[in-house]
Amino acid sequence: MAGQKIRIRLKAYDHEVIDSSAKKIVETVTRTGAKVAGPVPLPTEKNVYCVIRSPHNDKDSREHFEMRTHKRLIDIIDPTPKTVDSLMRLDLPAGVDISIKL
């Protein structure tokens, strides 16, 4: 697999979970002998939802809720077959969304 690059994008609502997952991935890849670039923190996506507090007629009273999506990027340069196999077997938390590009 010489000259290839694997790009892993992680998304999660909790920054502690995403950081621990990125740390697990980096440790696994360095243990198998491939080079790692990252984890690179990407901009946090912030969605704000405005909801009327009262179910009836008071429109001036509103409440704001926000949802933050934290993102990280990890590049694996020159992965070995052992690296790919160990990444497939890696157990990560349920709250992390992973997308992999070759």
Swiss-Prot record:
Cellular component GO terms, alphabetical: ribonucleoprotein complex; ribosome
GO process terms (BP): translation
Keyword Repressor tagged: no
UniProt GO molecular function: structural constituent of ribosome; tRNA binding
Record-stated family: Belongs to the universal ribosomal protein uS10 family.
Protein's job: Involved in the binding of tRNA to the ribosomes.
Name under which the protein is recorded: Small ribosomal subunit protein uS10
Source organism of this protein record: Planobispora rosea
